[in-house]
Design a protein with these regions (language model features):
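N-terminal Sec/SRP start-transfer signal
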Residues: 1-32, 41, 50, 333, ...
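Peri-transmembrane interface segments
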Residues: 40, 241-305, 314-316
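Hydrophobic alpha-helical transmembrane segments of multi-pass inner-membrane transport and secretion
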Residues: 13-40, 286-321, 344-357, 401-409
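Short helix-loop junctions at transmembrane helix boundaries
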Residues: 352-400, 412-416
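Alpha-helical transmembrane segments
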Residues: 28-58, 63-64, 362-365, 369
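A short beta-strand structural signal in non-transmembrane regions
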Residues: 56, 163-164, 225-252
Length: 433
């Protein structure tokens, strides 16, 4: 019987084309909408993680408590030993990267070597020179480089493009970094500006300076010492699991603290934070999740309403067929059951085609992206100019369920009208058709 119904659907275009087209369009739109919204939001999280917080962050609690002061004397020593511990006590798919957050005065000399301009800068030291480092790719420095090159030699730096313009710095110019060392003393070291970058975040473009990790350790007397260990998950890892991983690492840290490395200070207390604990990202996640649920909920409800009406209209046009089948002796409930099976077939077929179309569009936006740099240029959000969608199982589920449910429900509700009409009236509609 099922094969018979299936063949009947394809042979009768009035029962096939319109309902399946409505289901296909609705499911495709939901899959594409969920993928786009998920991609924009996860793009913002990944951008923030890459530039600043990491998905996970191991930091000394005394440093974190006074982070706005960039207290290098509260950094965490035993860099090599810490890396070994992280690799043995955390998930194997987490990639850990050491960084140094520093703050200093940037002194720009005139032709005589005297101070011409000075400004406070926010600095980040990371591994820019190692061949096996992911940091250059992670921060998209090659794509963000407007002029010059990335640091290759000793004591070279790249700075934000707006910072370079405000200080009137040219490529190859020597500048002096004035700051505090790990021991609390004053340091002054000369660097050569070799590149200008555009991060796409106004605050960073105006104040950010990037130098190599080894150069920073030499300048600030921080051998085998860093301020942060940033952990990065693969793109497929959902942010809802960050907290569980963080808690597991903190549990292991409590054991490690009892037998700490010899280079740690007595009051060093390393802690692990997730991105949700920093930069107010946690509250933003809750707000975005609520807004996404509301928008998708409204859209899904409207889609279900349209599909429901499509099922009702399809059923109304088949009242004559229902009367004929009743006249041949088919029972009311068997008739409703077979029509419901047809609605299920239509819902499944439409959902499959809709998933293919919506998934293809989402995959295209995930691979190619959509340039929205002009829209985000003044927003201050840490988000890429090129917005990419994200193909997720959740998007397919949110499209398939209303697609199938609405098709079946609309068909069954329209079919219930046969209880209110006589066979003669239903048969008369067949004659009128």
């Amino acid at each position: 019987m099922i094969v018979f119904l299936f063949r009947g659907i394809f042979r009768d275009k009035s029962r096939f084309l319109f309902p399946i087209s409505i289901v296909t369009i609705g499911v495709a739109l939901v899959v594409a909408l969920v993928g786009f919204m998920e991609g924009v939001f996860m793009g913002m999280i990944d951008m923030t993680a890459n530039l600043d917080t990491g998905h996970l962050r191991l930091v000394n609690k005394p440093f974190y408590d006074e982070e706005h002061l960039r207290p290098l004397d509260r950094s965490l020593a035993a860099q090599k030993e810490t890396l070994k511990w992280l690799e043995h006590n955390t998930n194997s798919d987490i990639k850990w990267a050491p960084r140094i957050r520093w703050g200093a005065l940037l002194d720009v000399p005139d032709i005589n070597g005297n101070t011409k301009l000075q400004t406070p800068v926010v600095g980040m030291a990371l591994d820019l020179k190692s061949s096996d480092s992911f940091e250059v790719k992670r921060l998209r420095l090659v794509e963000s480089l407007l002029k010059g090159k990335l640091p290759l030699s000793k004591n070279e730096m790249v700075i934000g493009n707006q910072l370079a313009q405000s200080l009137k710095i040219s490529l190859g110019q020597s500048v002096t970094v004035l700051g505090q060392s790990f021991d609390g003393g004053l340091v002054a070291d000369n660097y050569t500006v070799v590149g200008f970058v555009k991060f796409g975040v106004t605050a960073m473009d105006k104040k950010m300076v990037l130098i190599d990790l080894i150069d920073a350790q030499n300048t600030f007397y921080m051998e085998d010492t860093v301020t942060d260990w940033l952990g990065y998950f693969p793109p497929s890892f959902n942010f809802t699991n960050y907290v569980d991983v963080k808690n597991k690492i903190n549990f292991n840290l409590n054991t490690w603290i009892k037998t700490p490395p010899k280079d740690w200070a007595k009051d060093d207390i390393p802690i692990t934070l997730s991105i949700l604990d920093q930069q107010n990202i946690g509250s933003m996640v809750k707000t975005f999740t609520l807004i996404k649920s509301f928008v998708i909920g409204i859209f899904t409800f409207l889609m279900m309403l349209v599909l429901w009406n499509a099922g009702v209209l399809s059923g109304i046009h088949r009242y004559g067929e229902m009367g004929l089948r009743l006249a041949f002796g088919e029972s009311h409930w068997k008739l409703i059951f077979t029509l419901g099976i047809e609605g299920l077939f239509i819902g499944i077929l439409g959902s499959i085609v809709g998933c293919i179309i919506g998934g293809t569009f989402t995959w295209y936006l995930q691979d190619i992206g959509l340039n929205m740099g002009d829209a985000f240029s003044k927003s201050g959000l840490m988000i890429n100019d090129v917005v990419r969608a994200r193909l997720t199982l959740e998007g397919f589920i949110q499209g398939i369920i209303p697609g199938i449910f609405s098709s079946v429900t609309g068909t069954i509700i329209a079919s219930l009208a046969i209880f209110k009409r006589s066979e003669a009236n239903l048969f008369r509609e067949l004659e009128a058709g």
